[in-house]
Amino acid sequence: MPFTLGQRWISDTESELGLGTVVAIDARMVTLLFPACGENRLYSRHDAPITRVMFNVGDTVTSHEGWKLAIDNVVEDNGLLIYHGVRLDTEEPAQLREVFLDNKLTFNKPQDRLFAGQIDRMDRFALRYRARKFMSEQFKQAQSGLRGIRASLIPHQLYIANEVGKRHNPRVLLADEVGLGKTIEAGMIIHQQIMDGRAERVLIIVPESLQHQWLVEMLRRFNLRFSLFDDSRYSESLLDSDNPFETEQMIICSLDFVRKNKQRFEHLVEATWDMLVVDEAHHLVWSEKAPSREYQVIETLAEAIPSVLLLTATPEQLGQESHFARLRLLDPNRFHDYNEFINEQQKYRPVADAVTILLSEDDLNNEQQNSISEMISEQDIEPLLKASNTQGEERTKSRQALIHMLMDRHGTGRLLFRNTRSGVKGFPNRLLHAIKMPLPTQYQTAIKVAEIMAAKKSLEVRAKEMLYPERIYQEFEGENATWWNFDPRVEWLLGFLTANRHEKVLVICAQAATALQLEQVLREREGIRAAVFHEGMSLLERDRAAAYFASEEEGAQVLLCSEIGSEGRNFQFANQLVMFDLPFNPDLLEQRIGRLDRIGQNRDIDISVPYLEGTAQSVLLRWYHEGLDAFEHTCPTGRTIYDNEYDALVNYLAQPNELGDFDKFIVSCRKQHDEMKLKLEQGRDRLLEMHSNGGEVGVELANKIAEQDNDPDLVNFALNLFDIVGINQEDRSDSLIVLTPSDHMLVPDFPGLPQDGCTITFDREHALSREDTQFISWEHPIIRNGLDLVLSGDTGSCAVSLLKNKALPVGTLLVELIYVVEAQAPKHLHLTRFLPATPVRLLLDLKGNNLASQVEFESFNRQLNAVNRHTSSKLVNAVQNEVHHVLKASESLMEAEAKTLIEQAKQEADNALTHELSRLEALRAVNPNIRDDEVEAIENERTHILNHLDEATWRLDAIRLIVVTHQ
């Protein structure tokens, strides 16, 4: 094409320069000025990587003054184009010479980019289409928000998360027993609410000792990056913001941090939150006349925040008043009077009894049938009652139907979820091995001196000190005193590890210093490979230590953990636990054992406790084992008895040589424990457990998600994405890949990929066994960010390919069009479950015939060959008119396709939301726990979703020209 001064061209390789203007021409070279960035480029007149910018009738262009022109005629004058049309701002006729076009003009529409020569690679076009297709499919998946969790697929957890996570502003109490995964359930609910757009700002309030555990769990299991707020972080943020809590979207802080400072609390309340999560909610003390400050703090927040999750392991039978107080936080209108609550709870007793009868093998007698009929009086259940006394499948189905109806009437079933170990199978036995050892003379001397000097110390401080004689010894002999040279526990540990070379052993001690000193001794004395885990390490260092311990071949035999360092980490692959010392309270003891005693533990757990005779350790060991049975069984009564008997226990620990009535004390504690445990068992709410367990629904959920694990489409797409984005991949093993950033990535900083890289796997079990490995699913940030990177920009939006096919004439033109049907709506409506951005593929010949249904994308794509950009531009210029004709013809086809998709989405939304509304209204008639705002929310949601679907539109997302060749 001949060059003329003033013509506008665009660079094929540097599109960011904007529109160029021809400012100089000689026999061999042409100079372009790019006014938008003030740069010149010198090109050869032959084969220059530039494309002439020419607009067509129907296009809208912008002048350098900012006004827009709708083109209705194009005139050429001495090689320069003049565009005639109507100004959009004044609606008057106007003309615009090409030299006055906006210098910053960019080409966003795929066809504009194609005609402007900004043609992309063929593999990127294919990636874009796959990204559209897979993203659309993922939004429609029923298990959205649950599949990407880095956790085992445990039915009762999935059931609770699915049941609660889909609700509008859920307000529930998660009260599973210790070890059943309340934190994971809460994390799954948060993850779902965030993914569905129902929540963005989340506040988690926990005891100070659990902050890091939550931080680790949220990041490692759900890829949720929370910020930890303490005094220093708050003060630091106060310099940049009037309200520090508005500087982050997701925050974890301690209850003490909130309670201690009035200004801080006010800032917390003023910040707008979508969800509040409170762990260890049983510590919120309440009475009708004198609620505690902690309770009042959470109450104020719960009133202001629409969604609330409370977590507690304390059963309601151990304190009906505190149980009522927790329910009151969730729904103060419903739970406003304690006495009324007690009366109401008693009314539900017959409902639970009826379920127990239906679960038994016995036939229902007349009295029992009449009782159930009265409870479900608004429906005719006579046929179901008759069928329940028959045999076979009919009996089972009818009983299940009756149980389901009774569950709908359950008092707090919708707000409260509680699973017990007796109701959930899959837990190992716990076996205690207590090893008594003589107290070394060095310790005896140090303890005597400590007792003399501790006269002014409180009993509590003395009791805690007495548990750790090595620390007492070092206080007097100096930090470098080598207590490990004479402490018999060290010799025992060396022998134990040597005798169990093939076992992974977790050793927990109270202090980080003890763990570090033990590692040195094991390494120097016996060459035992040990990893250390303590609170002074970063998350990355802890991950590496955990991975070193988990590794089968070259890994550590033993992991030495401090109390705080081990929080939030579970090591089910090990079954040997050594407690080098004992923690001060039963909650911490259970937390230690809980590192191994989880669902998924396949072997019995051996708990070895080497203890020194005549010390506070021996006192505490007896109390835990004989008084609470806390080693070999979970101990739901432990905290209550600990609080009741605290003063006496501290007294015995502070003076272990003056035990006096200690045997009676042990008997008394065991009696309390047995009585409470019996009360718990008798008061077990089978109906609530059935409701919380999820039964077959939970199992089905787990199976469906398991079927989607290791999805070959995901693996192929992810590897293709990494290649095209420019991420380095190195195979570490059959299932592990190391990803690292490269210097030639599509973006300099790929979101979700650390600067020093990361190890990934598509296999859930591998991810669970290695702390340093990320589990890649469609929900992982690396994949989600990759999809966004491709689809939010122009990557792959236009391409040109050659098709070698001798059955077709040379030069035959096919146009492949990817349209997208979509609707815009606020995130919280979660419109994508009915109409995600849905790709529609058309493959048109010049006659307007659509061949897409006969020619599948992947097999067709494999037959095509790439074309370099310069040749592509020439081909496009040669067939520009034909392509315009095909685009015009495609619109009527697309109109019909879009109409069908939108109608289907409206029908699906109407059916789903009407069904949900009917279900809630029917439940509200028999169960007062259905909040009015839930029903109203569904009604509003239905109206808004149908309105937004009415406004759904379609647009061209990508275009590819295919030219037939025989070469």
Curated annotation (Swiss-Prot):
Gene3D superfamilies: 2.30.30.140, 2.30.30.930, 3.30.360.80, 6.10.140.1500, 6.10.140.2230, P-loop containing nucleotide triphosphate hydrolases (3.40.50.300), Tandem AAA-ATPase domain (3.40.50.10810). InterPro entries: Helicase_ATP-bd, Helicase_C-like, Helicase_RapA, P-loop_NTPase, RapA_C, SNF2-like_sf, SNF2/RAD54-like_C, SNF2_N. Residues 163-333 form the Helicase ATP-binding domain. ATP binds at D176, E177, V178, G179, L180, G181, K182, T183. One of its GO terms (biological process) is regulation of DNA-templated transcription. Residues 489-660 form the Helicase C-terminal domain. It holds the Pfam family SNF2-rel_dom. Its EC number is 3.6.4.-. Keywords: Activator, ATP-binding, DNA-binding, Helicase, Hydrolase, Nucleotide-binding, Transcription, Transcription regulation. SMART domains: DEXDc, HELICc. The keyword Ribosomal protein does not apply. A motif (DEAH box) lies at residues 279-282. It is an enzyme of class 3 (hydrolase). Belongs to the SNF2/RAD54 helicase family. RapA subfamily. HAMAP family: Helicase_RapA. Transcription regulator that activates transcription by stimulating RNA polymerase (RNAP) recycling in case of stress conditions such as supercoiled DNA or high salt concentrations. Probably acts by releasing the RNAP, when it is trapped or immobilized on tightly supercoiled DNA. Does not activate transcription on linear DNA. Probably not involved in DNA repair. This is RNA polymerase-associated protein RapA. It comes from Proteus mirabilis (strain HI4320). The lineage of its organism: Bacteria, Pseudomonadati, Pseudomonadota, Gammaproteobacteria, Enterobacterales. The gene is rapA.
